Structure formats: C-alpha cells, structure tokens
Amino acid sequence: MEKSQGYLELDKSWRHDFLYPLIFQEYIYALAHEQGLNRSILLENTDHDNKYSSLIVKRLITLIHQQNHFLIFDNDSNQNPFWKHNNNLYSQTISEGFVIIVEIPFSPRFVDSLEEKKKILKSNNLRSIHSIFPFLEDQILHLNFVANILIPYPIHLEIVVQSLRYRVKDASSLHLLRFFLFTLNKSISSFSKRNQRFFLFLYNSHVYEYESTFLFLRNKTSHLRSTSSGAFLERIFFYGKIKHLIEVFANDFQAILWLFKDPFMHYVRYQGKSILASKRTSLRMNKWKYYLVNFWQCQFYVWSQPGRVSINQLSNHSLDFLGYLSSVRRNPLAVRSQMLENSFLTDNAIKKFDIIVLLISLIGSLAKAKFCNVLGHPLSKPARADSSDSDIIERFVRICRNLSHYHSGSSKKKSLYRIKYILRLSCARTLARKHKTTVRSFLKRLGSELLEEFLTEDGQVISLIFPRTSSTSWRLYRGGIWYLDITCINDLANHE
C-alpha cells in the first residue's frame, strides 16, 4: 500500500509539472536501488548495495538541502581522492534519481496502480522485443525494399535538453539536467559509462521526439488533403518551426502528402537502428531517404550523411537486427497435377522468412566478457572462484538460460548448442581452478550433474509448451519460438 501511495504521489507531481522537489525524497533513491536489482539479467548486477545505502542517501539529501551543496562538484575537490569519490557517487546518485522521477509514470508497476489497469495491460505483449519478429514474419514476405537506418546522435547537449521541453515542463528540473550535462562535460565519457541509464533515457527522449514527428506525418497526412500547410505546422510537435522547413512544406506540401500516402510502409526500431520496409519501388525508397536526411537536419539540427540510410532489395539482402540475421528466401516446390490421362509438373517458389543467430556476434560478446577467447575456446572466470560451487553453477546456468530464451526464435539451433558448450566448459574450468584440479578429473568426479543443470530448465519450459505426445509440436519447436516477456537485451560485457 505504501509503495502504491508513493507512485500516486509521483503521478500527482508529474501532472502538476512540479518534479524538482521529488529529488529530496528518500524513496526515489530506494526505487532506483530496487529497479537496479530487479533489472533483466544475463549477468549479476554489482555495487548496488553500496551505492544506495541509507547513510549515503541521507547525507546526499542533507547536502542538496544546503545552499552551497553544489560546491562538492568544484574542480578543486578532485585533488582529494575522498572528495573525488564522493563527486562521482553524488552525481551518479542524483542523476539516477532524476531518471526515476521522469520515467516512473511509464513504468509497468505504476500503470498497475491506475484505474484503467485492465485496458492498458492488454498491450503488455507488445512491449516484448520478440513481438517484432512475428510481425515481420507476417508482413515482410509481401514487401520488396528495405532501408536500414542508423539514427544520428545530436551534435550538442542542449539539443537533448530542448527535446525534453514538452515532456518535462518543470524549469528547475531542466536546469538540473543542464547542470549535469555541462558541469561534467569534460569527463562526459567516464560519466556516461557509470550512468548508462541516465544517458539511455536522454537518447530515448531524443528519439521519441524524432519518431513522434515522423510518425505523425506518416499516420495523419492521408487525412489532411483539405488542411492548409499553415494550420498543419501549428501542431505541437513542430516547436522548432525553422524557416527552411516551413518553406519546404509550403512549396512542396502536396508532393509530401503523396510521398507519405504509402499503406505498405512499415517501420521498426530498437536502440539506434531502425528498419523502413515498403512494397513500393526503389525510386520511392530513395525519396524517403532524401526526406529523412533533410528532416533530421532541418527539424533537429542533426547532421546525417546519406550513407546512414542504406536501401536494399529484400530478395537478396539479410537484415542484421536485434541479434538475428533475417532474410527472405525462396523454397522451390514441385507440384504434380493429374488431368484425365495427362499429368503436369509445376515448379513453384514459396517465400519463407528465415531467421538465424549470428554465432560470430555471440562468441564476440562471450569473449568480451572473458568466457572464451575470440576463437570460441572456453576460459575460466577467476573472479568467481571465491563463490560457492552451487553459486557458480547457478550464475552460469542463468546466463545460458537467458541466452537460450532470447535466441529461441532461431530456425537453426546448432549455434545455441555451441554457446551452451562454451558456457558449460567455462563453468567447469572455473570450478576446476577453484578446487586446483584439472577439468577432466573434475568432470569425471561431477559426472552428468553439471550437464543436467544446463539442460533441466530448457526441458521444463519445452515440456510445458509442447506435450511430448505431439510430434508436430516438437517439429515446430525446432523451427523457433517467440516469447512475449522479453523487454531488453543486455550485452554480456556490460555488467562485468
């Protein structure tokens, strides 16, 4: 009940556009701590217990209340290692608290506390990353061209702040955001590594503004034939009303409407990559490319080279997206028809959306996290040798389970078997190193127990989904499964 009350208090502050006082509340940092611990895991998260201890939070709030609290960020304090540590700690803690404040109205837990709970929960499955692939399986077979887009980054930090103006209307909060970005500008690289959630929020806010305007044009222009360009530009998202952009819309408004009236256009994005697919011709796709480059430059002051948008024909191109390599291939099919005394043999080609796992990319992530070398040979993890045997095995099994869970949609499972082999042998080498013995003797002593730990979870999940009596279902499993509870991807090296 107390937690729900806290979320409702956040909602009240959000609706009244007065967020800054929430930074002084202890429960904000408790929420940041809890969300850090409950993050979707491939590896265990560390350092959260020290970062958000009650003593540190109380001291931080006391310093914030003081009139000269920002003196802790003074450059002279960096000469003292103690103050330098506090500088990093306080800036990181405040920044994560700030992100909690502006993120919380969109969190699933907060949505559960609202009155319209049942209506909103119907769309929970659409939050899953895997929901993209069934959509592609249904739609992409009927499309001809695809544009791979690398979304450009803003060239100046002030552009990021300006992108937040219509979402965060509290001037004090925006000034605090500017303080973080410009005070820590000299050490922005190290600060961004320690505060990944903070910068991820800023980047997503920037992309949100871009997509809101872009999708508004995409969805609404077919209904705006009788609307003048002047009224069209008064929409709230066009706060940047640049003279050049107005001239473009005023002179070429009908042409732009014609460009956007494409019912066969599909748009998908994750992180900094997006896909624009269409049934139209190559000429239409090149017009989209020209429009996107000018749209970024004129509306968001973002310089983008045309090379960041590459157009390819789906029949001879593979999509590298979300850890999968997707392609449309043709399966030849011969059909024999009997007509009275004559028979005919007809050759048909059936399109199939094929999805496989990028084994090289997965091995690269494992090598980056020191589970193996670049060639895929398993390595031990000396940092975990101090843990108990059961804890070490449980950690490796968790990583293996999450990787298998995410890449279960692959039509070829051999790549996953290779990854499981690397993790299993890396686990065995870590345990052998701990007990100061060889891997061979350790596996001989442990027997099949280690293998069962890595396979039990997958077997339980498969048996729940597909009864063993159904051979057809097991054949479908070998083809691929999509889960609707996966909301993020973590690079294996991020938590090391």
UniProtKB/Swiss-Prot annotation:
GO MF annotations, alphabetized: RNA binding
Entry keyword set: Chloroplast, mRNA processing, Plastid, RNA-binding, tRNA processing
Keyword tRNA processing: yes
Coiled-coil portions: none
GO CC entries: chloroplast
Entry's localization field: Plastid, Chloroplast
Alphabetical GO biological process terms: mRNA processing; RNA splicing; tRNA processing
Keyword Chloroplast in record: yes
Function: Usually encoded in the trnK tRNA gene intron. Probably assists in splicing its own and other chloroplast group II introns.
Family: Belongs to the intron maturase 2 family. MatK subfamily.
Name of the protein in question: Maturase K
Organism (species): Paeonia peregrina (Common peony)
Gene field: matK
